[in-house]
Structure formats: structure tokens, C-alpha cells
Amino acid sequence: MQEETEMATQNSREDIMKQLDEKAREYLRISGNCAQSSFSALSDQFGLGDSLMRKALSPFPGIALRGETCGIVIGSLMALGLVYGEDKLGQQEWVKTLRPCRAFCRAFAGEFGGTACDDVTKGLCGRTFNLANPAEAEEWRNTGVAAKCSDVVARGCRIAAEIMLDEKYKPA
């Protein structure tokens, strides 16, 4: 009986990850915005919803295309914040959010060389791009890095989902 339960949980987890992967890739294809795509995939998969959050994430790929914090990190941390965070000012309960969020950042940086867009881009193609510059943005698209970002969005969402599904991070 325990074996069947473990298999059902594993299958459910695998199904969740597969659906999440498909959503993350599709949303990035539609929007071209890694922050919105990662948040939207996680939000839809875990019922976190809120179109205002998606709207607020508009300028966050690389922090306004400056090569700074990767939009996938921001979108994923926003989703984790909705799961683990507090909505009242003045409470110190928000500190509980740091543990799962730091775990996400460690895992993401471990796989992609850092949490900055420039770190990820350099790891994918050996150099960085100024995506606010139209010529460099075109070069970025032509090198195929944009397509590789789809893999990063999907993996970033999986890292966040693994944390959300992990018992040791269950919200109180």
C-alpha cells in the first residue's frame, strides 16, 4: 500500500512538472518575458493567480534589460513569496520566506552560474548582451540564446515547484 501511495505521489509530481514545463515554455514563446512567464506558469500550476502581479513583472527581465537579476529568479521568488510570505506590514513572519527563497537562489545559481541575467547568458553562450541595445538584442536572438532561455525558464520553474512540493518547506 505504501509503495502505491509513493508511486501515485511520484506520478502526480511528474505530471505537475511536465505541465509546468509546457506552460513555462509556451508562456515565454507568447510573451518573450521571462519574469512574467515563470510567475505565470507557477501561478497557474499552483493556483496563486493575479493578473496585477503579471503586469507588475513587465519590466523585470534582467531588471529592465540591464543584465541584472534574471527575470526567472524574480518571477519564481514572487511565486514563492505568495506561498510562504505574509501580507501584513510589521510582522516579522516574512523571515520564514527567506529559507525557501534562498534554497531556490542556491539551486538556480548552482545550475546557471549565478542569479543575474548576465551570468545566465554568459553560461549559455559565453558572453553577455546589452538587450536594451537593438543591435545586440538582434544578435542575441540570432545566436539562439533566446531559445535556450526557454530551457532556463522551465528549469527555474521546476526548482521553485520542487521547493513548493517539498514537505520541509510547507507553510505553517
Predicted regions located by residue number:
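Short cysteine clusters
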Residues: C34, C70, C117
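Phosphate-handling active-site elements
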Residues: F46-K55, L82-A103
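A short glycine/serine-rich beta->alpha loop
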Residues: E22-R29, P59-E68, W140-A147
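DPxDG-like acidic metal-binding loop motif
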Residues: G75-V83
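Polybasic, low-complexity association/targeting segments
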Residues: Q2-L28
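Acidic-glycine-rich active-site phosphate/pyrophosphate-binding loop
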Residues: T9-E14, A41-S58, R127-P134
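C-terminal binding/interaction regions
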Residues: R99-A172
